[in-house]
Design a protein with these regions (language model features):
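NAD(P)-dependent Rossmann-like dehydrogenase/reductase catalytic/cofactor-binding core
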Residues: 137-226
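Short beta-strand to alpha-helix junction loop
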Residues: 38-43, 121, 173-174
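Rossmann-like NAD(P)(H) cofactor-binding subdomain of soluble oxidoreductases
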Residues: 2-66
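A short, mixed-charge helix-start or loop-turn motif at secondary-structure junctions
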Residues: 3, 114-115, 166-170
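Internal alpha-helical scaffold of NAD(P)-dependent oxidoreductase catalytic cores
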Residues: 47-58, 63-159, 187-194, 204
Length: 226
């Protein structure tokens, strides 16, 4: 689900796929999984639109660099939808991946929000570390030692600490974090909410990554409508 120029999500591809499936679907017990990142309320709207489909929202938590490993070693399964449908999917997940991986059954909106919480938290973490790196550079602090001391607090976690990042650049790019943080900010505006923390994280990213390389990923990260 790429973003529009204004930051809101564009579900044209997803909607067209469901339209085709709805037209071809002949069985009442088929379950369709949506794994695309969509703002809360989107899946419910699509379920109402395509009432002959049984839709479950099952967000993926894969990184582009280690997608296969992440798929095999999932930390949890989030299933949003009607309980009778999420139960069937959950049973399949347990059969395939074993019973040790938690399966969380919930409604559409909660499942959709969990995915955004995940991506936007890590995007904010990246921006925070970039700001700390700016301070370290200005005051001649040893960045490697600072990170070592910082991460020794087990609550911090070891991910998204590298500045520059794995791509050798500052901030975050790619086809996920930029579109997702913009989408959640745009969605919050529709709800008449102001999110200064997320907005600040996005502003920092625009400063440290002025090339805005995600805008080159047309169709994946952004849709430029005329």
């Amino acid at each position: 689900t790429p973003s529009n120029v204004d930051g809101s999500i564009n579900i044209d591809i997803l909607d067209k796929a469901l339209e085709d499936i709805s037209r071809l679907n002949k069985q009442k017990d088929n379950i369709i999984l949506i794994r695309s990142t969509v703002t809360p309320g989107t899946t419910r709207s699509l379920q109402n639109k395509y009432s002959n489909l049984n839709i479950v929202f099952n967000p993926e938590f894969l990184t582009e660099r280690s997608a296969k490993f992440d798929f095999i070693n999932q930390s949890r399964f989030i299933l949003g939808g009607k309980n009778k449908h999420t139960t069937k999917v959950g049973d399949l997940m347990k059969w395939r991946f074993g019973t040790s991986t938690p399966v969380i059954h919930t409604d559409y909106e909660t499942a959709e929000l969990i995915k955004y919480m995940n991506n936007c938290f890590f995007a904010t973490k990246v921006s925070f570390l970039n700001e700390m790196k700016m301070i370290a550079d200005k005051c001649n602090a040893n960045w490697s030692t600072a990170i070592e001391g910082f991460v020794r607090d087990g609550r911090i976690g070891h991910s998204h600490l590298s500045v520059p990042g794995p791509d050798g650049k500052y901030g975050f790019g790619g086809s996920c974090f930029p579109k997702d943080i913009q989408a959640l900010i745009s969605f919050s505006e529709e709800l008449d909410l102001n999110l200064p923390t997320l907005q600040g994280a996005w502003n920092t990213n625009l400063i440290v990554r002025p090339e805005k390389d995600w805008e080159k990923l047309e169709g994946r990260a952004i849709v430029k409508k005329i």
